[in-house]
Curated annotation (Swiss-Prot):
GO CC terms in record: cytoplasm
Protein family according to the UniProt entry: Belongs to the AceK family.
InterPro entries: AceK_kinase, AceK_regulatory, Isocitrate_DH_AceK
Name of this protein: Isocitrate dehydrogenase kinase/phosphatase
Species of the source: Pectobacterium atrosepticum (strain SCRI 1043 / ATCC BAA-672)
Length: 591
C-alpha cells in the first residue's frame, strides 16, 4: 500500500507540473494575437499572469498531497522515497529539468525550506548531461542564399506567421542586405548559412525573429525586431549580428520573452551558439522559466564554491541602509539580505521591501532594473566567510541567522547580478566614459519613469554599470509607481528670511517630490553636474514629470528598444520631446 501511495504522490506532482506548464504555454501562445492586435496592456497583464502561474500550481499540488497522504506528507523519509519514484518518471519526459525544479518547489513548500538535502530534492539533475543538449525535433529552419540574400530574405520573411501586412517589405530587405554587406565581406555572405527559430520571441511591442548566421569564421547572432506602425503594418526596425547586442537583447535587466517552447532544454541548447556568454540559468530566465533559472543559478553557485577557495566579503561600495550586501571576489553575483533594523531616515518595513522586489520581478524592467532570485535557508560554510563579513552579519541581521556550528544559515536573501556601482565607476572613468555613463544614467531614469516606475532614491550608489556600459538600477526599497508621486515646483519665498531658514517655507506631503532639488543632492561634483544638466536638464523640471504622468494615465505605453537608437534602420518615431519655456526656463517633456 505504501508503494502505491508513493507512486500516486509522484504522479500527482508530475501531473501538477503538466498543468502548470500547459497553462504557461497557453499564455505564451497568446502573445501573437496580443502583438497583432497591439493590445499592449494585455501584454503587460499576461507577463504578470505567467509569473504567478508557477506558485499557484505549487500551492494546488501541496493541498492535494496533504489530502492524499495526511500526516505522511510531513515525513521527510517518505518524500525521499517518493523522489526516487519521481526520478523514474523522467527519462522519457520532455521537460524533465523543469519538472525537477517543480518537485523542489513542492518539497520546499511542504517543509518550509528545511532539510534541503540531495537525497530529498534535486540539488543537481538526475538526468545525464547529454539530455540537456539534445534537440529531438527541428526547432529551426535553415536557409542558404543560393539565389542571393534578397531572394532568401523574401522567402524567410514570407514564412513569418504574423497575419498583418508589411509596411514596405522590399525596403526592409534592402536595409538588412545593406547592413550585412557593410558588416561582412561578400565572400563571407556567399558562404553563409542562416538558421532561424521556428517560433518568434515576443516582448513589449516587438516580435523578434532569432537566427544563427553561420559564416566560415564563426557563428553570429541574427536578430530582427519586428514592430508594427499605427496603421497595423509590420516593419523591421534593425538587424543585430554582434554578440554584445544579442547579450543585451537577452539581458538580465529585461522582461522575459514569450516564446512557445514545449521543450525548453532544446531551445536553450539552440540559443547557446549565439549567446556564448550567457549561462544556463540566464538562458532559462530569458525565455520565462524563472523558477528553473533559480535552480540553475544555485547550481552555478555550488559549482563555483566547489572550484574556488575564496571567502565571502562585504560588497564594494557604500553600505546600504536597508540591505547588507556581500559577494565572492570573482563571482558575478551579489547576495542581499534585508537588515533587521533600518537607518532612521528609512521609513519602510521589511515587508514593504520584499513587496518592492516582487513588483520589479513582475513589472516591465525596460533593461534598467536587475532581476533577482529569492532563496530561503541559504547555507554557507563558516570558514568561507571573512571575519569582517561575519561580524557584519551578526551585527546587522542576527534575526535572520541560524548557527549550525560549522555552517551559517541565512533565512532569506536575494541573489542578483553583480555590477560596478556607478559611484565607484565615476571615480575611475576617463572623459569619454564619464560622458557616456552620465548619458546612460539619465536615460535609465527616463526609461524607468516612462515605464511608470519612480526610483525614489536616485543617488549614484543605487545604480550599477554592466560590462556593456549599461546603467541599471538595483536599489528597490523606495520605488513606487510614477502615478503615486506628486511632482511640484518649489513655490517662491514669501520673504527674504524664507530663503535663509533651516526649514522649508512650504508644506511637504509624504509623496511630494521637487525635481528642482535633484541637482543639489545627486551631483556634488561640479563637472558631473554640468554634464548631467546639459544632457538631462529636463529631469529638473516638474513639467517633464507631469507630462510623463499624463501619458501614463492616458494609457500610453512607451516603445522600448533593447539596442541603441542609432542602430535603428530609420527614425520612424515622432519627436521624442517638445521644448517649452516657463518660469523655470527651458523645459523638455515627452511629445
Amino acid at each position: 500500500m505504501t508503494r502505491d501511495l508513493e507512486k500516486l504522490v509522484a504522479q500527482t506532482i508530475l501531473q501538477g507540473f503538466d498543468a502548470q506548464y500547459g497553462r504557461f504555454l497557453e499564455v505564451t501562445a497568446g502573445a501573437q494575437q496580443r502583438f497583432e492586435q497591439a493590445d499592449w496592456p494585455a501584454v503587460q497583464q499576461a507577463m504578470k499572469q505567467r509569473i504567478h502561474l508557477y506558485d499557484h500550481h505549487v500551492g494546488l499540488v501541496v493541498a492535494q498531497l496533504r489530502c492524499i497522504t495526511g500526516i505522511r506528507c510531513d515525513d521527510a523519509d517518505f518524500l525521499a522515497r517518493m523522489k526516487h519514484i519521481y526520478t523514474g518518471l523522467l527519462p522519457d519526459y520532455p521537460r524533465f529539468e523543469i519538472a525537477e525544479s517543480f518537485f523542489n518547489s513542492v518539497y520546499c513548500r511542504l517543509f518550509n525550506h528545511r532539510e534541503l538535502a540531495p537525497d530529498k530534492l534535486f540539488v543537481f539533475s538526475s538526468q545525464p548531461e547529454k539530455r540537456f543538449h539534445e534537440i529531438p525535433r527541428p526547432i529551426a529552419k535553415t536557409f542558404v542564399p543560393t539565389d542571393g540574400w534578397q531572394r532568401m530574405l523574401e522567402k524567410l520573411l514570407g514564412d513569418v506567421p504574423l497575419r498583418l501586412p508589411w509596411e514596405d517589405l522590399p525596403r526592409d530587405i534592402d536595409y538588412i542586405v545593406t547592413y550585412l554587406q557593410s558588416t561582412f565581406s561578400a565572400e563571407q555572405l556567399e558562404q553563409a548559412t542562416l538558421q532561424v527559430a521556428n517560433e518568434l520571441f515576443y516582448r513589449n511591442k516587438a516580435a523578434w525573429l532569432a537566427g544563427k548566421l553561420s559564416l566560415p569564421d564563426g557563428v553570429f547572432p541574427f536578430l530582427l525586431p519586428i514592430h508594427h506602425n499605427e496603421r497595423g503594418a509590420l516593419f523591421i526596425d534593425t538587424c543585430l549580428t554582434a554578440q554584445a547586442d544579442a547579450s543585451m537583447v537577452f539581458g538580465f535587466a529585461r522582461s522575459y520573452f514569450m516564446v512557445y517552447a514545449p521543450q525548453p532544454s532544446a531551445l536553450v541548447a539552440w540559443l547557446r551558439d549565439i549567446l556564448p556568454g550567457k549561462t544556463t540559468a540566464e538562458l532559462y530566465l530569458a525565455i520565462g522559466c524563472q523558477k528553473h533559472s533559480k535552480t540553475e543559478y544555485y547550481r552555478e553557485y555550488l559549482h563555483y564554491i566547489a572550484e574556488s577557495e575564496e571567502q565571502f566579503i562585504i560588497a564594494p561600495g557604500v553600505k546600504g541602509m536597508v540591505m547588507l550586501v556581500f559577494t565572492l571576489p570573482s563571482f558575478d553575483r551579489v547576495f542581499k539580505v534585508i537588515k533587521d533594523r533600518f537607518a532612521p531616515q528609512k521609513e519602510v518595513s521589511a515587508e514593504r521591501v520584499m513587496a518592492c522586489y516582487q513588483l520589479v520581478k513582475e513589472h516591465d524592467r525596460v533593461g534598467r532594473m536587475a532581476d533577482t532570485q529569492e532563496y530561503e535557508n541559504f547555507v554557507i560554510d563558516k570558514h568561507r566567510i571573512s571575519p569582517e563579513l561575519l561580524d557584519e552579519l551578526w551585527r546587522e541581521v542576527p534575526e535572520k541567522l541560524e548557527d549550525l556550528g560549522d555552517q551559517l544559515v541565512i533565512r532569506h536573501l536575494y541573489m542578483e547580478r553583480r555590477m560596478t556601482p556607478l559611484n565607484l565607476y565615476l571615480e575611475q572613468a576617463n572623459a569619454q566614459q564619464l560622458h557616456d555613463v552620465i548619458e546612460e544614467y539619465g536615460n535609465a531614469i527616463k526609461q524607468l519613469a516612462a515605464a511608470n516606475i519612480f526610483p525614489g532614491d536616485m543617488l549614484f550608489k543605487n545604480f550599477g554599470v554592466t560590462r556593456h556600459g549599461r546603467v541599471v538600477f538595483y536599489d528597490y526599497d523606495e520605488i513606487c509607481y510614477m502615478t503615486e508621486v506628486n511632482f511640484r515646483k518649489i513655490p517662491p519665498p514669501r520673504y527674504l528670511e524664507d530663503e535663509l531658514a533651516a526649514e522649508p517655507w512650504y508644506s511637504v506631503a509624504p509623496n511630494d517630490v521637487f525635481p528642482e532639488e535633484f541637482p543639489h543632492f545627486l551631483c556634488s561634483d561640479r563637472h558631473i553636474r554640468t554634464l548631467f544638466e546639459e544632457m538631462h536638464g529636463d529631469l529638473f523640471c516638474a513639467d517633464y514629470w507631469r507630462a510623463l504622468q499624463q501619458r501614463i494615465r492616458e494609457g500610453h505605453i512607451e516603445d522600448v528598444y533593447a539596442y541603441r537608437r542609432r542602430k535603428r534602420f530609420s527614425q520612424r518615431a515622432e519627436p521624442l520631446y517638445i521644448t517649452t519655456e516657463n518660469d523655470s526656463g527651458l523645459c523638455r517633456y515627452p511629445a
